[in-house]
Amino acid sequence: MVHRKTKDRIEYFVACVMEFAKAFDLDADQSFDYLDKYRGMDFLVKCYEAEHTVSFPDAVSDLQKVCRRNGGRL
């Protein structure tokens, strides 16, 4: 059985991946792979408590900045 907190985090991570995909015209797999490669997913996991309180556009912007600092070009 999945705990509610875990389910909430998973749903938030999926939503962020999809919002990032939409912002950069990617499909879900491309978005996840990019975020994983350039440490955006690590950022979401590490900073979930703060990050889930901001809007999705702000979260996408934060992810873009993190990924750029780690070699991403979007």
What does each model-identified segment do?
Residues Y12-C16, L44, L63-V66:
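N-terminal, charged low-complexity regulatory/assembly segments
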Residues M1-A28:
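N-terminal acidic leader/helix
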Residues R4-R9, R39, R68-R69, R73:
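Arginine residue identity/basic-tract feature
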Residues A21-A23, D27-H52:
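Amphipathic, hydrophobic secondary-structure cores in small proteins
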Residues E49-L74:
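Long, compositionally biased
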